[in-house]
């Protein structure tokens, strides 16, 4: 009986600790409405793409696919969520109201699979929102199998000058998953976004 009780306590402690050490945002039918597709066509580019919510067995994921083309100063398609005075998706509600210090969040984990291409995370914070220097970016690689990609915040660089970024997760204003920067076919699946301590 003591062994069973000890095992239960160990399992409970492990689950509680895991939950306390990260903020996880799986893609679902309910929260996918918080995300939007954008392409370089908003600035005269000719890249084309779309997003769809799909399922692979028990795994629900969002898929970003299309053709990235760099003509006309373009070169991106992206899946993005953002917060505003009139809209605050659950991702930002939990980040901004976290009882832990957002500055102690260490980075991002994504559960992804793709077509072997390199993709990007674009982040804007309240400090640099809507400024030309405002995007902080990091890259990750993909494979045809599901895998967890870990991107520490200290890997992010400023898009304009390539300097190191200092990101406090509680200051994040926009978060984008982006196919960017060269001519290629995008096909990326993401089942969850997680911020870890």
Q: Where is each model-derived feature located?
A:
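Generic cytosolic/nucleocytoplasmic N-terminal low-complexity/intrinsically disordered segments
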Residues: 1-2, 98
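Sec-dependent signal peptide recognition
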Residues: 2-8
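Hydrophobic h-region of N-terminal signal peptides that target proteins for export
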Residues: 10-18
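Beta-rich carbohydrate-recognition modules and glycan-binding surfaces
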Residues: 18-197
């Amino acid at each position: 009986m003591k062994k069973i009780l000890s095992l239960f306590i160990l399992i409970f402690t492990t689950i509680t600790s895991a939950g306390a050490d990260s903020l996880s945002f799986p893609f679902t039918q309910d929260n996918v409405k918080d995300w939007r597709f954008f392409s370089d066509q908003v600035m005269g580019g000719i890249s084309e793409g779309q997003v769809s919510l799909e399922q692979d067995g028990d795994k629900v994921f969002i898929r970003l696919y299309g053709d990235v083309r760099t003509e006309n100063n373009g070169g991106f398609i992206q899946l993005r969520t953002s917060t505003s005075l009139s809209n605050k998706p659950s991702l930002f509600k939990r980040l901004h109201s976290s009882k832990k210090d957002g500055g102690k969040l260490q980075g991002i984990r994504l559960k992804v699979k793709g077509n072997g291409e390199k993709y990007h995370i674009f982040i804007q914070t309240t400090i640099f929102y809507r400024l030309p220097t405002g995007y902080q970016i990091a890259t990750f690689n993909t494979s045809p199998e599901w895998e967890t990609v870990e991107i520490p915040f200290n890997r992010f660089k400023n898009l304009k000058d390539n300097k190191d970024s200092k990101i406090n997760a509680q200051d994040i204003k926009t978060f984008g998953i982006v196919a960017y920067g060269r001519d290629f076919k995008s096909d990326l699946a993401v089942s969850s976004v997680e911020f870890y301590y």
